């Protein structure tokens, strides 16, 4: 009986503080310091991928100018540099969803390598070996390049 009176009195105080309407978790969050900034709504957009382009959120630091590699860490063209450095448009993609989609950015990357190094695929395979670190992905791309060479396209 005493417990009911205490909890009933507590509800009355809260209802008087928040107003006469029903209580919800959103009402409680509005009263938190910061105005409920943790529970902001996130806008969901349809996914869209392009070869060589990462998705960058507005206001994110990932797309800010000057956040790339420092010039001192860039690889030089000297003997310690890679044998076949890819041009900027041939950098390996970083935005693969790994779902096995038919228009995979890695397959587009293999096609771009073949078009750039038009020597029958030898330099494309060498660049692939040098710039792709995942062994499973290398095997998949090797097979794709070899199939395209055999089919003549």
UniProtKB/Swiss-Prot annotation:
The gene is OXLD1
List the source organism: Bos taurus
Q: Enumerate the residue ranges of region (Disordered).
A: 55-87
Outline the extent of the Oxidoreductase-like domain.
84-118
- Per the UniProt record, one Pfam family is Oxidored-like
Q: Output this protein's name.
A: Oxidoreductase-like domain-containing protein 1
Q: Which domain of life is it from?
A: Eukaryota
InterPro entries named in the record: Oxidoreductase-like_N, OXLD1
């Amino acid at each position: 009986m005493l417990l009911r009176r205490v909890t009933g009195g507590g509800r009355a105080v809260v209802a008087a503080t928040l107003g006469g309407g029903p209580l919800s978790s959103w009402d409680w969050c509005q009263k938190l310091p910061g105005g409920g900034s943790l529970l902001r709504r996130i806008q969901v957009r349809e996914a869209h991928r392009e070869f060589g382009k990462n998705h960058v959120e507005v206001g994110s630091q990932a797309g800010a100018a000057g956040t790339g590699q420092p010039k001192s860490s860039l690889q030089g063209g000297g003997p310690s540099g890679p044998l076949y450095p890819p041009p900027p448009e041939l950098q390996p993609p970083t935005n693969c969803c790994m779902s096995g989609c038919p228009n995979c950015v890695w397959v587009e990357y293999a096609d771009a390598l073949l078009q750039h190094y038009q020597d029958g695929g030898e330099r494309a395979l060498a660049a692939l070996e040098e710039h792709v670190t995942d062994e499973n992905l290398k095997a998949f791309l090797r097979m794709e390049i070899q199939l395209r060479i055999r089919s003549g396209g």
